[in-house]
Structure formats: C-alpha cells, structure tokens
Amino acid sequence: MDHRDFLTRFLDASCEAMDAFAADEAARETLIRMGEDVCTSIRNGGKLLIAGNGGSAADAQHIAAEFVSRLMYDRAPLPALALTTDSSALTAIGNDYGYEHVFERQVTGLGQKGDVFLGISTSGRSPNVIRALHAAREKGIITFGFTGVAGNAMTELCDRLLLAPSPQTAIIQQIHITAAHMLCAVVERTLFPVEGR
C-alpha cells in the first residue's frame, strides 16, 4: 500500500487549517483575553483547571505541565491542574456516579470562585466536559472552551471559546495544543516579563 498520497493530503489539510487559524484575528484576541483572565485569577490566588477525554485528556495534562514547569524560559511555577490524572478519583466517580460526572465532581470539590476551568472537546458534545462547565459556572469559575465545531453545546457555557477550523479530530487537536502553547506564553510573558521575549 502506498501511503504517500494520503500523507500529502493529510499534511495539506493540516497546513490549510493552521493557515486559517493563523489568519483568524478573533482567535488571537480570544487567546489574549483568556491569558488576561488566567493572569487575573492567579494574581488573586486562583488556578487553572483543565479537562478533556482521550487525546484532549493528554492535552489537558500537557497544558498543566507547561504551566507548572515552564514553556519558554525559566520562571516560578504557575498553578494548573489537569483533572484527568487521578485514576482513583476518576474510577471512584465513574463507578459510583457515572463517567459523565468525573470532571463535574472534581470541579465542584477542587474549584473555587475566581478559578478558571478549560474544557477541551473536539466535538463540543462530551457529556462530562459539558457537566463540568455547568458546575464551574455554578461556582463562579471562569469558563473556557477549546473545540472544533461552531454552534455546539459549549457555546452557551463558555465565557471564552476557541474554535479550531477543521472537521478532522486529529487536526483540531493539533490546533488546540498550538493554542494552548500560545495561551501559556501570554500568561508567562505577562506575569514574568523578560525583555526581548
């Protein structure tokens, strides 16, 4: 089997979506506003909570790691927590209440007013992410969403929403992690400014 044509088409679709994202002024403004919200939260003693499923769960952990460790240069750790990492909590909640509650209960138990919650769902329809967004709003937590489909259930639940311009899950995920790096960079540059960076 010759994979060359498929790989060329995949790369073309990836580049096309990334070009569309790069040209989207509104997306950049959204990321800047998200960064400002995260900075305000952290300055006031808050934190960033992040959740998603599958590849988006890995993205949640990746994002939290960039905040707690570093992205572009050495600086103090920033408070971020992926709600996808505690296997005991995930399996207890999933077993006792149902998988759709695994993030909702963590947001309710760990989140505080003024925190930020980022829900990641390529489809915008993940029940556990939707429930977590509802729980966050009830607690006065600022709600962000990364998704790939306009007009989905996350639209009404997110204070700030970033849409990846592709119908393909893998390419949506590529844009999400790029956006996450941009978000972290905005926060890092704001809270720990370094001349020339």
From Swiss-Prot:
SIS domain location: 38-197
Pathway(s) served: Carbohydrate biosynthesis; D-glycero-D-manno-heptose 7-phosphate biosynthesis; D-glycero-alpha-D-manno-heptose 7-phosphate and D-glycero-beta-D-manno-heptose 7-phosphate from sedoheptulose 7-phosphate: step 1/1
Enzyme class, spelled out: isomerase
Disulfide linkage: none
Cofactor(s) listed in the protein's UniProt record: Zn(2+)
Protein origin, superkingdom: Bacteria
This protein's name: Phosphoheptose isomerase
Subunit composition and interactions: Homotetramer.
Co-factor: note: Binds 1 zinc ion per subunit.
